[in-house]
Amino acid sequence: MDANSINSFFLIGALLTAVSVLLSPMSSRLGIPILLIFLAVGILAGEDGPGGILFDDYSTAYLVSNLALAIILLDGGMRTRVASFRVALWPALSLATFGVAITTSITGMMAAWLFDLHWLQGLLVGAIVGSTDAAAVFSLLKGRSLNERVGATLEIESGSNDPMAVFLTVTLIAILANVDTEMSFSFMFISFIKQFGLGICLGLGGGWMLWKLVNLSKLADGLYSILVLSGGLIIYAASNKLGGSGILSIYLVGLFLGNKPTRGRHAILNVLDGMTWVSQIGMFLVLGLLLTPSDLVDILIPGFALAFGMILFARPVAVWISLLPFKSFSSRDRWFISWVGLRGAVPIILAVFPMMAGLPGAQLYFNLAFFVVLVSLLVQGASLTTAARLAKVELPPKPLPVSRSGVEIYPSSEWEVFVYRLSESKWCIGEPLKRLAMPDGTRIAAVFRDDTLLHPSGSTRLEAGDILCVLGQEKSLEALSNLFSQAPENKEVQRFFGDFFIETDVKLADLAPIYGLSLDNLADDMTVADLVVLQLGANPVLGDQFQWQSLHWVVAGLYEGKVTNVGIRLPTEHSL
């Protein structure tokens, strides 16, 4: 490649990236996933688009996509709270294994019938599109206030279901490439356990080693993120090299680092946030360039049938069967999880495997995977907000600070500065600072008014528009935000928790005469907390709901895993 070609490459790459960034606000206005914007830019720049760029290098696309996916999973793991595993780990693993297998089987049979394929070829198509995509799920769920059980299940599933899809895809390619070779069940089982086992061991072990290395190292501030990124990629590559799941390993590395006091954690997350955006843009641009839309014309009708068959039948069946042992999921929860079976880059990456293996019909598999991804992003991704509202899994937006940043007092410092802007509706307006019930271990470090830094004392009275800089830790964030912040207004969602609230230590016997409750066969000293456990099980989450004796009960407050208060919605005909 000469200097002119290199400059042309830089020019085109930078131009496409800039166009993708500038067009990204269109996603919210049009109600479509931002990933689809990036993909569309790549398609328009490609062979059939006005850009006319001829790109058919599957090896390069495979390299770029795997690198991008690894970075996205590392970032996603660091932002996942391990506390969510309490309610979501086993359901997510069930979806990541049995769910993928069921989706693969049903989708595979549909593909074999629709495209007149051998049943093994159909199963290969099912395996390629069988897993949800971490990049798509993390991107579309980011910033949404969903029921913790539902949101965490979807995120953990998307980060852990790729090993099953890769295992099925690689196994089926090996069978189709060597039709005379018999593969025993024990061989396939061992291969599956190896992928998961090595992926988990290397991810957790490597994550621990990387965490120790980061905290023991004394580097320039900007180098910690590079160390984490390079260390994560080393573990990702080593896991793949040894026959494990690199995708699972790097997700667990991020999970480990994100839930430990790590030196420079906030700076690392800030850098990874930018790297994740670059990865998403680069990955979907390259995949868009790889597609020739005219190749999809021949599979248009059966392709739609396959995509909607998977969305409306295969995925829901897989979800309902996989979640049968978990009674805490309501029908609405299961429906929403079924709908958010988003496909993205992973199916397209897996579709490159048959191309690189030289299998007959590989181009058809690739085109089908791309078509299913397009339909999934357009239909499921664009309707995510509506689906969350209909399923009633969207919670009121949490009050949050305007910004937050870490304070590196010592290597593993957990101190942060939270910045709040006071609105006129806050009760603390006009009150002196000494009257504020600040959480323990927090302090107002600075007050800004009209771009002027004040020297606050106990008698300083707060005014609307004041900007407060509060020193504290994440454990105090909720209390501080309730005190100073204001969640975006959404009356329909705000009514989510009910007409009024009661504490869970109240006895049902005290409520019975007020609301006409029948307490037959219930203990006289039974409390609201006991009722919640009876109805929802031992691990309720914020937003869980149940109907009991004409009243609608909603979990409205939690502290250290225990319900502190519930909201009650009265029947419309009830009057106080």
Curated annotation (Swiss-Prot):
Q: Is Protease found in the keyword set? A: no
Q: Give the membrane topology.
A: Multi-pass membrane protein
**What keywords are assigned to this protein?**
Antiport, Cell inner membrane, Cell membrane, Ion transport, Membrane, Potassium, Potassium transport, Transmembrane, Transmembrane helix, Transport
Q: Where are the transmembrane segments?
A: 6-26, 34-54, 58-78, 87-107, 109-129, 163-183, 185-205, 219-239, 242-262, 271-291, 299-319, 335-355, 359-379
Assigned GO CC terms:
plasma membrane
Annotated GO molecular function terms are: flavin adenine dinucleotide binding; potassium:proton antiporter activity
- An example Gene Ontology biological process: cell volume homeostasis
A Pfam family found in this protein is Na_H_Exchanger
The RCK C-terminal domain is annotated at 405-486
SMART domains in alphabetical order = CorC_HlyC
NCBIfam families, A to Z = PRK05326.1-1 (NF003714), PRK05326.1-2 (NF003715), PRK05326.1-3 (NF003716)
Described by its record, this protein's role is as follows:
K(+)/H(+) antiporter that extrudes potassium in exchange for external protons and maintains the internal concentration of potassium under toxic levels.
Any idea what this protein is called? Answer: K(+)/H(+) antiporter NhaP2
**Gene transcribed to yield this protein:** nhaP2
